[in-house]
From Swiss-Prot:
Tissues where this protein is expressed: Red blood cells.
Gene Ontology terms: biological process: hydrogen peroxide catabolic process
Subunit comment: Heterotetramer of two alpha chains and two epsilon chains in early embryonic hemoglobin Gower-2; two zeta chains and two epsilon chains in early embryonic hemoglobin Gower-1.
Species of origin: Propithecus verreauxi (White sifaka)
Span of domain Globin: 3-147
Statement: the UniProt record of this protein carries the keyword Transport: yes
Protein name, as recorded: Hemoglobin subunit epsilon
Lineage: Eukaryota, Metazoa, Chordata, Craniata, Vertebrata
Length: 147
């Protein structure tokens, strides 16, 4: 279980309140699919994923990215119980979708990069550390069903 200090929680909540979920979600998922092309196999029904520009402009990537980041809001609300908050998603990704749990870490890292680009100098090393801790905790929670 991940333990967050009051300061880390405050930092995460402060940034999350300013996140454009639709924009950042599409960018994070798009970046995952471009940087780690083998992840595209989980999205074969998304249509054209043939190039970085096709991926980043794909409406299905944007829509699913928004869905992913919206569910990530549950992590922000449930920092003290990530495993419980993601139990159903863990089961779905393990039992039905058969997603390699390493991909959760990759998506989390892509999300941190997107937050850094969106918030610039405001995304200090302390802010990044809090967010890395959260995305790592979410990745672990999503991988829970695999163990």
């Amino acid at each position: 279980m991940v333990h967050f200090t009051a300061e880390e929680k405050s930092t995460i909540l402060s940034v999350w309140g300013k996140v454009n979920v639709e924009e950042a979600g599409g960018e994070a998922l798009g970046r995952l699919l471009v940087v780690y092309p083998w992840t595209q196999r989980f999205f074969d029904n998304f249509g054209n994923l043939s190039s970085p520009s096709a991926i980043m402009g794909n409406p299905k990537v944007k829509a699913h990215g928004k869905k992913v980041l919206t569910s990530f809001g549950e992590a922000v609300k449930n920092m003290d119980n990530l495993k419980g908050a993601f139990a159903k998603l863990s089961e779905l990704h393990c039992d039905k979708l058969h997603v390699d749990p390493e991909n959760f870490k990759l998506l989390g890292n892509a999300m941190v990069i997107i937050l850094a680009t969106h918030f610039g100098k405001e995304f200090t090393p302390d802010v990044q550390a809090a967010w890395q801790k959260l995305v790592s905790g979410v990745a672990t929670a999503l991988a829970h069903k695999y163990h």
